[in-house]
């Protein structure tokens, strides 16, 4: 806990306040009717799953009016990351790359449709059939070109050459095939297409400056999945590149599940692994098989998220495993955020951020203080009862309660940064209720030991013989409590989930403490004279418990065997 730097649990909105984000639904051209109750409810559900996946982060998402959604993020949460999670539409497409080059001030003066720059990546179909996106430098890009075929000639550094390269790329088949490679390769003698759409896209590509934030936001705006488009992306060196992309070959709805994992085998750091549906797997295998036969950069496919290229791996062979992996300069939070967006799906509407404000605590520190005081009073009453009834045994019970409380505090503090757990007032109530559950386990064990002593056994045998019976009772009792907490967690939403989560967590900790601390400690104390001799303040005095005297068996004298009787003399 101290090594991680998280020494206190995160508090929920009701206790510490947080941030309020107001999002406004914006209809696309000709789709004003898309803003309806069904789509708004779907958006709320997806946003809630993104920021509150386990239901314990205390984030709240609710509608306001016909087209506004308000998201409440508790204090201590990365508000910038949360804003990206809830506002990102997360429309994912896999598109073939037709042309790419460095953009704006990052350009080196040698743009061409065959230039891979610093964002050229490699997708290899290894044991797991993962398409691995590794941002590489120029040398590695060259090596990749050699691995996939003979590199094509680069066009000269001039506006005319740039236009020709882009024009030739647009002539390429959007769904590359084995024969499209030669036609797609840039040639100085190639002429611009006369098609209006092609010319317009060529102009957009030539004018696109990806170093401009506004230009990046508008790149590919309004393009349909089955149309060619332009887009921007950033490579591992932080340089912006612009792309001409073909029609989408696979879309995000074909992603069955996504997960953030730390790749230790290839030293790629945090990556996002995706598993496609059966239909998506077939599409992915088809497109990668076609791309593998092309020359760079048309052997690359771009993973496009909300019109921005997040990865552009190149392919050396068809990937048939139905899995893909996105890697790059991700940290854990970024990888988890992307995995959540891919897993929970795209928003049905586009949202614009209207306002971000700081909200105060709904209840404040006084309620938290009152809850802690109530917990302290409950704990004190339990301790007094133990002292009165169990006397010396209360030392073991109090030590066990302190260990359980310490473990609960540490785990709550660590769960904040790991799963976003936030402590609200219902969760505090769950921790208070857990005091009774923990004390109940001690009482069951102590009473079993006392029963054995009443039967006339000494303390050490009584401790060992009582444990199997007490263990079964404790496990059954804790299982029922945990089952109730699990059902409550599943069927409820909002703050009640915090109560159920805390109750279930402390129930599991009760089992750990009883098995690994209470029982070994009682076994150790049974060897001490104070307890073993049955001192009157030990709580295990045989006389006070009404113990039966130990049973003693006496041997009856054996009777002589019957034999012939000598006759008496007269």
Curated annotation (Swiss-Prot):
GO molecular function: protein-transporting ATPase activity
Compositionally biased intervals (Low complexity): 147-161, 172-196
Localization terms from the record: Cell membrane
TM region(s), chain numbering: 370-390, 395-415, 419-439, 474-494, 498-518
Family annotation (InterPro entries): SecD, SecD/SecF_arch_bac, SecD/SecF_CS, SecD_1st, SecD_SecF_C, SecD_SecF_C_bact, SecDF_P1_head
Oligomeric and partner information: Forms a complex with SecF. Part of the essential Sec protein translocation apparatus which comprises SecA, SecYEG and auxiliary proteins SecDF. Other proteins may also be involved.
UniProt name for this protein: Protein translocase subunit SecD
Organism for this UniProt entry: Streptomyces coelicolor (strain ATCC BAA-471 / A3(2) / M145)
Lineage: Bacteria, Bacillati, Actinomycetota, Actinomycetes, Kitasatosporales
Gene: secD
